[in-house]
């Protein structure tokens, strides 16, 4: 996939750095706040979310939009999962994908050029757009989910705090571990350019999975009995693991289904009201296997059935009674 250079779309120049995958930092880092002190006030109908069902980083924001009941406050455009040689594209040529009803953009990079005509860098989803100023608020998923978590509470968002202050330090700690070992670790494995880089990365992936399996043997969620942001950040990788990362990214030591506690935990989260509708395996599989870098011949495999609606055994653990799940 290419990038923008001084506001113009161009083919990407590969990074030859010792065969290891390096994820660039997000560039737009403003925040929406209830008081508008940041320059962006929380207002129903003002903001628009550009996403892909295939992308795990975008999936985080789709989940939080659903959990917090923001569908009527933050509109959303869903990119096509296939043929991303010129970046993320919008249209109705794939079930569940949409046109851009706000700006009429065909390509995601058009939003970046509109926000900054001299922008140089990657064009990514999720991207949170401000209709009032015609600018990008933020394209960092970890920050967008925090805005969705609490920024619209005064406007009637669903109850529930996925980043409670008394658990923030532990959530941050486990987030760092899961990001390095798994969220980004599967990409470091799949895009490794040398055997040494691959061996190092895949070892970290399964060390992280082993640690999480042990942790979840004695508690319902990553941070005890409370469902938090950390669980949703892990969920988006787990739900893709057997469908794409196990084969396409060469994480083949063990399938996720062989981890008893993680497999049940995944189904527990998938069955939280509102979450199943955010998981589109057709988009996920097409998105990864249509990538020339991952799968040069572009053949999209037919998967065995992955049934996340099967019963799980996680109800044997306590769940914090003060937390209200989305209805």
Where do the language-model regions lie?
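C-terminal alpha-helical interaction module
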Residues: 1-327
């Amino acid at each position: 996939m290419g990038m923008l250079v001084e506001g113009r779309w161009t083919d990407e120049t590969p990074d030859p750095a010792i065969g290891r995958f390096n994820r660039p930092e997000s560039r737009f880092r403003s925040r929406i706040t209830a008081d508008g002190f940041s320059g962006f006030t929380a207002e129903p109908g003002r903001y628009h979310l550009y996403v892909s069902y295939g992308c795990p980083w975008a999936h985080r924001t789709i989940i939080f939009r659903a959990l917090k009941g923001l569908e009527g406050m933050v509109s959303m455009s869903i990119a096509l999962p296939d043929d991303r040689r010129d970046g993320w594209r919008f249209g109705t040529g794939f079930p569940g994908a949409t046109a851009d009803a706000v700006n009429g953009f065909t390509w995601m990079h058009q939003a970046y050029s509109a926000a900054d005509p001299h922008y140089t860098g990657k064009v990514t989803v999720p991207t949170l757009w401000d209709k009032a100023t015609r600018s990008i608020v933020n394209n960092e998923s970890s920050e967008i989910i925090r805005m969705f978590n609490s920024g619209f509470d005064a406007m009637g968002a669903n109850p529930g705090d996925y980043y409670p202050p008394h658990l923030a330090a532990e959530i941050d700690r486990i987030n760092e571990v899961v990001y390095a070992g798994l969220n980004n670790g599967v990409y470091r494995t799949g895009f490794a350019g040398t055997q040494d880089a691959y061996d190092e990365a895949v070892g970290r992936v399964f060390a992280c999975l082993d640690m999480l399996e042990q942790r979840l043997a004695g508690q319902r969620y990553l941070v005890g009995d409370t469902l938090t942001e950390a669980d949703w950040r892990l969920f988006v990788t787990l739900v893709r693991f057997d469908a794409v990362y196990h084969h396409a990214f060469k994480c083949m030591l063990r399938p996720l289904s062989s981890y008893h506690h993680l497999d049940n935990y995944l189904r527990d989260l998938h069955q939280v009201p509102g979450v199943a509708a955010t998981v589109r395996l057709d988009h996920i599989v097409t998105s990864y296997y249509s990538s020339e870098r991952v799968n040069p011949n572009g053949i999209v495999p037919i998967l065995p059935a992955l049934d996340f609606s099967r019963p799980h055994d996680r109800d044997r653990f306590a769940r914090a009674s003060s937390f209200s799940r989305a209805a």
